[in-house]
Amino acid sequence: MAKISRLFGSTVKAAITAQAGFHGKRIPAVSSLQEHIVKSTPARYNSTQACLENDISGTDNKGFKGHDMLAPFTAGWQSTDVDPLIIEKSEGSHVYDMQGRKYIDTLAGLWCTALGGNEPRLVDAATKQLNTLPFYHSFWNRTTKPSLDLAKELLDMFTAKKMAKAFFTNSGSEANDTQVKLVWYYNNALGRPNKKKFIARAKAYHGSTLISASLTGLPALHQNFDLPAPFVLHTDCPHYWRYHLPGETEEEFSTRLAKNLEDLILKEGPETIAAFIAEPVMGAGGVIPPPATYFDKIQAVVKKYDILFIADEVICAFGRLGTMFGSDMYNIKPDLVTLAKALSSAYMPIGAVLVSPEVSDVIHSQSNKLGSFSHGFTYSGHPVACAVALEAIKIYKERNMVERVNRISPKFQEGLKAFSDSPIIGEIRGLGLILATEFANNKSPNDHFPPEWGVGAYFGAQCQKNGMLVRVAGDTIMMSPPFVVTPEELDELIRIYGKALRETEKRVEELKSQK
């Protein structure tokens, strides 16, 4: 083992700081095949870190080891023993560290800087609003014009199903917490006090606050936090490559998952199930596009039992998939919608909840009875955040960003999927400007590389060494470049990916020879 550990350089440590992979305890209501894989991942994650920890010896001490931040999604040893990668400047699709090194930011920050790192119109919008009205709240029927304008804009542009009201938050996590409170408020108003349970999916990501982390189907967000909350259930992840049965078609797979969902509803009692929440394409769980008819079948089930459908569009909205919203891509007709990230291109923290007339009318009536709708945040509808979001939406429309994504995404998708024949790649999946590579031994979803090899972390380190940042989660690599990425930058991205892959193939071959 020590011999294998020495094969890993200190650059791997920098790559694994981005990990928030698939690890943890059993998720309820997951099929036995999926359960086996979910339960097998904690050892993979932990032993990879243990192996890498043996070689924490960065050569260029920048003086920030043991810094003062309790860093999100970061292991303690990383903060104490490894200098963080400190990003100082951004331009377009690139970011620069404190030493002036330039990187292609293939994850657009965290799936969010859709307009790149230095869009002057967004800076100007923020500056103008700061000079006019830097803050005012939206409580007690007092508010600001940017928040009213943004609410109208969002309601007008979401066309998958008519929406009637918008509620503003500071993040996707807060927005999904709000969704739960709205649904409970709604069912209480209708005299259904027992209809309170939520169904999410294994490998889903819906946030990291108390309730949104419970909805999330990545057990690392539950472990030692006493989560998930008891009112949250999880059903199957729609990842066909990994979870289909032998000989099962995508259509049959989707039918089985819909049947499993219905069985779960019947087991719990339809009168207890309030809502189903789903990302159109799963993001942090590994970029998992569903089979073509999956959402049609799922929606039929939830509608049958009077269960609300919440579309978590935090990653997919505003063009990421090649449609303005992910709901447009998959014919989803949600009752509630969650937005954040690209809403402001991440230049200001802001999230939103869109509420259908059927739900908002009930909430309106109930708030009249109670004298108030007693939910909100100090910064709900912050005028600066709303002004920036309004300008971002103007840019998306004026520059035809959806059309642009459709124009450049074939180069991105086809250029990377051309590497699918690599002996260490199990699957490359994605659409639009979002993609994942999953490494697998013998190209099989059921044949993992030994966890101590850290194949994904090594690939990520090679990318970083060559001027590109990717997201590493176990042996899955995720990418979602800014919408403004150029064809030339995509050529460079593909070149670095290929170089990192060749180095990783060599490393895997070397490790196999040590067994």
Curated annotation (Swiss-Prot):
It catalyses: 4-aminobutanoate + pyruvate = succinate semialdehyde + L-alanine; 4-aminobutanoate + glyoxylate = succinate semialdehyde + glycine. PROSITE patterns: AA_TRANSFER_CLASS_3. GO terms for molecular function: 4-aminobutyrate:pyruvate transaminase activity; adenosylmethionine-8-amino-7-oxononanoate transaminase activity; pyridoxal phosphate binding. Its main location: mitochondrion. It is found in: Mitochondrion. Belongs to the class-III pyridoxal-phosphate-dependent aminotransferase family. Transaminase that degrades gamma-amino butyric acid (GABA) and uses pyruvate or glyoxylate as amino-group acceptor. Cannot use beta-alanine, ornithine, acetylornithine, serine, glycine, asparagine, glutamine, glutamate, valine, leucine, isoleucine, methionine, phenylalanine, histidine, lysine, arginine, aspartate, threonine, tyrosine, tryptophan, proline, or cysteine as amino donors. Acts predominantly in vegetative tissues. This is Gamma aminobutyrate transaminase 1, mitochondrial. The lineage of its organism: Eukaryota, Viridiplantae, Streptophyta, Embryophyta, Tracheophyta.
